[in-house]
Amino acid sequence: VKGYFSASGRFRSDDMKTSNVLAFVGSSAGCTFFPDHVTRSDEESYPIEIKTYPAPKFEGGGDYAVQQGAGMVVIRKSDEQVEAAARFLKWFTQSDWAIEFSVTSGYLPVTAEDNDMVKIEKDSPSMKKNVRDSLGTAVQVVRQNTLYTSKAFKNGMSARKKLEYAMSDAAKADRQRVVEAIENGATQEAAVAAFVSEERFDAWYAQLMDELNELAAQ
């Protein structure tokens, strides 16, 4: 609403590569896409250093963190195919390979035992700094929080999309009204006042909950 947020590339790491943003919120899996240089033009680029932080918590809130990632399932097939899939999953989650996959992809290892930075660094001493920093932060979050993942339910994908875009869509619409007010002579402070208040947030939240409840009732 104040003009400090931007999302023009496909991913926020793309916006960082072009100096369009200074910081972004992303998953640990995004660390493999972190740029080490910012390119402003064909003639100008410069190196950057990246710091990763745990997701913030609400004041007074509990120690919870959202966990999600790529899932694997075995669908109903022949006994031979089911056994082959089970063998693959068992191999895929074994310690040595799980850590190797984690380092190359940014995803965390499957087992609690393997979520150990001493073990990860010992097995992969040459991993990139961005990956090391991101995995270190992610492992810290796993060990210091109770993990939560959303359950599957009817219209769950629609609800997820609504949650993904509800705030950004509202902010874009409000920002447009702020720009129009400034063009008509209002100050920045006066133009944004009505859109950054507790009342505006409460109204947005109430509307969002109504829309989610409507989806859940279908």
Language-model features: where?
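Sec/Tat-exported extracytoplasmic proteins
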Residues: 1-3, 20, 28, 35-38, ...
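Extracytoplasmic/periplasmic substrate-binding proteins
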Residues: 1-87
